[in-house]
């Protein structure tokens, strides 16, 4: 079923010889077609990709070790495979160093027959600082270089769930979005800075999430540049106290100036959540205000925990907004976090998560209040 990887074709890349790892030379050519709707998957390594829903996947960002078999298979399905791009901003304030970083990644993409780069820089930046201007220039120059050297390539940039200097990431979001092919909005970790009560809350509350897209579009960023990122993981919080109303008070862990944050909790994959929820004290609960599921359980020491996560119901509500607002697409962090074993129950659970990405885009109406 899976394409065999064999060294069969030699191609010239950047003046040196790179050997095509696929059984057919055409599978080493950059993907040229533009997808009207993007389903953007982050992959962190291993072979989970063999179980992705390739009927909808359009781009895979390879955040794990390079996998030639994944490259060949993605290309056989018309999907792009793109590099991860990360660099300390202090290293690219200098224009010459910036150009060297870009060329290094262009040449790497060529050697590996890849289709572009996802720039994932989540560092704190002060507005109008040298780093602020360097980051904007980096995205513009990277896009220009990739487009010139690898026709059809895609350059994307990951942004925080809101443009309001989240975690002190004060970027020139409008200029960045204008200069690259798309921006992946990381609509998760929305409790990274808690300024109010230090309590467990949803990873991506619906109204807060959608309001942030209105803010991005209010900056005159084209909706067709925005890909909504949803979480395939949740947060497990230890409760210092669980009130009668179900409010879980959590330990204070400061982050970038805020007195409390989701760093108080532990990230857990959806696959683990599905195993744990049936034996939990509460079973699945639903918060009508945040439009998100959660549950409570006791650990081996008798300590109460509260877990907030996203599931097909909460993701479908967000996917509906994607269609209503005609965003560029939807994606997730990350594709590896589902259970892809052969148990029929978990297979159904995983299929429902994939289906939630697209099933209600054009039928449901979401209003931000």
Question: Residue spans of the language-model regions?
Answer:
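Glycan-binding loop/region signatures in secreted carbohydrate-active enzymes
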Residues: 21-37, 41-42, 230-321, 343-369
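Glycan-recognition patch characteristic of GH18 chitinases/ENGases
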Residues: 17-110, 133, 141, 201, ...
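Conserved, mostly hydrophobic/aromatic
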Residues: 60, 119, 183, 228, ...
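A cross-domain feature marking catalytic cores of carbohydrate-active enzymes
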Residues: 43-45, 64, 83-87, 121-123, ...
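Alpha-helical scaffolding within the catalytic cores
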Residues: 44-48, 65-70, 100-105, 164-173, ...
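Active-site and adjacent substrate-binding regions of carbohydrate-active enzymes
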Residues: 120-144, 151-161, 306-368
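Cleavable N-terminal signal peptides of Sec/SRP-targeted secreted and luminal proteins
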Residues: 1-18
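Substrate-binding surface in catalytic domains of secreted glycosidases
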Residues: 103, 123-276
């Amino acid at each position: 079923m899976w394409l065999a990887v064999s060294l069969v074709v030699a191609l010239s890349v950047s003046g040196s010889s790179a050997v095509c790892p696929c059984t057919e030379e055409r599978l080493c050519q950059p993907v040229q077609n533009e997808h009207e709707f993007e389903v953007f998957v982050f992959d962190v390594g291993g072979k989970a990709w063999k179980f992705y829903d390739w009927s909808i996947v359009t781009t895979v960002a390879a955040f794990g070790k390079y996998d030639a078999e994944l490259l060949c298979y993605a290309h056989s399905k018309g999907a792009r495979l793109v590099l991860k791009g990360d660099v300390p901003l202090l290293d690219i304030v200098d224009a010459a160093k910036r150009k060297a970083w870009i060329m290094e990644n262009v040449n790497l993409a060529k050697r590996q027959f890849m289709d572009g780069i996802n720039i994932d820089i989540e560092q704190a930046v002060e507005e109008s600082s040298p780093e602020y201007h360097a980051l904007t220039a980096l995205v513009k120059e990277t896009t220009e270089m990739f487009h010139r050297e690898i026709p059809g390539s895609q350059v994307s940039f990951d942004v925080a769930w809101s443009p309001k200097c989240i975690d002190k990431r004060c970027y020139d979001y409008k200029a960045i979005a204008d200069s690259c092919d798309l921006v992946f909005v990381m609509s998760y970790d929305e409790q990274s800075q808690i300024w109010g009560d230090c309590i467990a809350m949803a990873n991506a509350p619906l109204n807060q999430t959608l309001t942030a897209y209105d803010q991005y579009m209010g900056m005159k960023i084209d909706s067709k540049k925005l890909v909504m990122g949803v979480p395939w993981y949740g947060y497990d919080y230890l409760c210092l106290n669980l009130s009668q109303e179900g409010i879980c008070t959590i330990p204070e862990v400061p982050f970038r100036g805020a007195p409390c944050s989701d760093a108080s909790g532990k990230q857990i994959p959806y696959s683990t959540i599905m195993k744990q929820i049936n034996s939990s004290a509460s079973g699945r609960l639903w918060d009508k205000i945040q439009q998100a599921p959660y549950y409570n359980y006791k650990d081996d020491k008798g300590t109460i925990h509260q877990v907030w996560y996203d599931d097909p119901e909460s993701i479908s509500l967000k996917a509906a907004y994607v269609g209503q607002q005609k965003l560029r697409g939807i994606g997730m962090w990350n594709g590896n976090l589902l259970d892809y074993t052969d148990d029929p129950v978990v297979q159904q659970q995983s299929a429902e998560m994939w289906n939630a990405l697209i099933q209600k885009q054009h039928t449901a109406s979401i209003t931000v209040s």
